[in-house]
């Protein structure tokens, strides 16, 4: 029984153009400056299976009857081996099974050399595990490489013993087939050698560009769709269409960036590279439309206003939701999301989008406002009350009635339009119904606080000037503080010196007083001694009890 490849289960309706909707009143919203710029389908995606592509990096040359020696091929082989050697060594380090006696980390039953990964995220470790798993099937991969080595077809599907589908891609074989095979017998060997060398050198340059980041660590840096496009060349769309088996437009898938590749293994013997292509699983939400809205300023009682509406909405089952799509991938025709980002909108805004313009909320604009015109679907939408709208072909000035919110200018009205200094070539006819009976003057408009851009700018300038003044005052006080601090320091030093001086003077005075006292004592002692010497009889009689010294 034939096994279908489990890589992708996709439910998709081919995008053929989405017409106007019933939930959003696009024609009526034009009166207040709301334009539907783009309508896209809503797609959900999740991680899917993987497909494997074998890239043959060396072409097969047709036989030359033994008369030609193609030296450029040998040089290419040597250079290519040098280029791929770091990749081969790195893949070997990641996939090497650590000895059971040493410390190991196991993921999904395989052993990953974590030292080769360094600091890795969960996704990067998952990629490394994929490399290890692929190397566990090295025998099947080698058999696969051998089976495609002799073919010179650009794309050939082969199935290994495990019934795993892989695609052998020889990106440069197309060049070889077209440039060499038909003329191998009619030109000189040197010319063929030079031609082959130029082709191989160009491809080497592309390979160097592709594998610049992978040389560091292929497990941590997946191949982008741009790298895959360079690597697989013109065969990429064929590979995708044959392998994905889906109605999803190939260009749409490629532009989404959701298709990535991972280098799994390299065969040095055959110079073949095994790449794992990761393709998400897609499913479309039937009947859902993601609509981009552009709101330009409109005229209301000779005042410039802008309506408050979301930038992007989701229309589904006659309901409207705000849909920013911040975590989604937006392509020209689809929005790819992992989950629904829709959120409710206010009732007044909902009624406004449904066509009840009296429920719309506007913000007055004072000053310059850049969103005064929009160019969508080949038609110009402009607020010609706030802009000078001049038609260059045929020459005339476009006037806008006071009751009209905006002016809609198609090719019937003007083929080349001048808005101030901008020039637009109008290419389409406006075929929607413009509700001319709606008057902005009679509308029951709910105003928010005015958005005065000029005053806001002046306020900002005043704040900046005030900040500069405060900074200048701060610097002045800081300088004053530094000056005062200096004076305080000098005063403190002077005070300390004064105290020291007073202490020294006090000590000197005390010393002088003590010295004078000692001098007085010395003088008294000297006088007593002198009197004793001059009157010895007095002291002798006195010593016997006769105080007067008379016998």
Swiss-Prot record:
Annotated S-S bridges: 68-189, 328-337, 352-360, 384-389, 391-414
Membrane-crossing segments per the record: 493-513
Marked site (Cleavage) residue numbers: 106-107
Signal peptide boundaries: 1-23
Q: Where in this chain does the entry annotate a coiled-coil region?
A: 132-160, 456-481
Query: Which residues are on the Extracellular side of the membrane?
Result: 24-492
Q: What keywords are annotated for this sequence in UniProt?
A: Cleavage on pair of basic residues, Coiled coil, Disulfide bond, Fusion of virus membrane with host cell membrane, Fusion of virus membrane with host membrane, Glycoprotein, Host cell membrane, Host membrane, Membrane, Signal, Transmembrane, Transmembrane helix, Viral envelope protein, Viral penetration into host cytoplasm, Virion, Virus entry into host cell
The record gives the membrane topology as: Single-pass type I membrane protein; Single-pass membrane protein
Sum up the protein's function in the record's words. Answer: Class I viral fusion protein. Under the current model, the protein has at least 3 conformational states: pre-fusion native state, pre-hairpin intermediate state, and post-fusion hairpin state. During viral and plasma cell membrane fusion, the heptad repeat (HR) regions assume a trimer-of-hairpins structure, positioning the fusion peptide in close proximity to the C-terminal region of the ectodomain. The formation of this structure appears to drive apposition and subsequent fusion of viral and plasma cell membranes.
User: Can you name this protein?
Assistant: Fusion glycoprotein F0
Q: Which organism is it from?
A: Human parainfluenza 2 virus (HPIV-2)
Q: Which gene encodes it?
A: F
